[in-house]
Amino acid sequence: MAEPATDHRQATAQRNVEAILDACEALAARGAALTIAALAAESGVSRVTVYAHFDSVPSVLQAAAHRAVERVMAVAAGMDLEPGSGLDALERLVGGVWPLLGEMDGLSRATGDLLAPEARRAAHGEVFDLIDGLIARGRADGSIRDDAPAAWQASVIYALIHTAVDDINHGRIAAADGEAALVSTLRAALRA
């Protein structure tokens, strides 16, 4: 059995990590500079505490991106993606996670600015695996075209999602129109 002091330290450490990740998301959403000092101030912990858990701002961003992906995957896990074609399932997935995507736009922009492309891709690994599976299913059932590499199609989906959120946040498209515009564009790009 764990000692009470150890349990308390572990709980405190976990609360600190969550506070730092929340701070990262909040700062990114505001477009504020992501620095260790800013993360410490926003999270209410010291810079030493931030460094005790993360060795750099990119490591905080990677952890925050991983947590965001976990939220997306939790929503996806609650969805029934089995019926219909691969393209139908992909459209349902995009529609199901769409409400989360706007909340994560600042974090997405920050990871784009501060993480190397391979680190961004790794942070989104589970989402890409899910999308890759739906693309493969759609190619096999004939609902998704097979005249372009599947990896390219996954990158197109990723880029379109982030572009749609960015356009909404910059007033180029109404929020109410975002999901429908995204789904119809994905359908046009992918349909066999």
Give the positions of each predicted feature.
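Short hydrophobic/aromatic patch on the recognition helix
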Residues: G44-F54
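Basic, helix-initiating cap at the start of DNA-binding domains
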Residues: M1-E42, S59
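Alpha-helical DNA-contacting segments of helix-turn-helix folds
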Residues: P58-A68
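Short amphipathic alpha-helical elements of helix-turn-helix/winged-helix folds
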Residues: A23-R30, G96, L100, L160
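Hydrophobic/aromatic-rich alpha-helical bundle segments in the mid-to-C-terminal region
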Residues: S108-D113, R121, G125, A140-T185
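Hydrophobic alpha-helical connector segments
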Residues: A63, A74-E103, I157
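Helical hydrophobic small-molecule/effector-binding pocket
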Residues: L87-G112, R121-G133
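Amphipathic alpha-helical interaction segments
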Residues: A19, A38, S59, D88-G96, ...
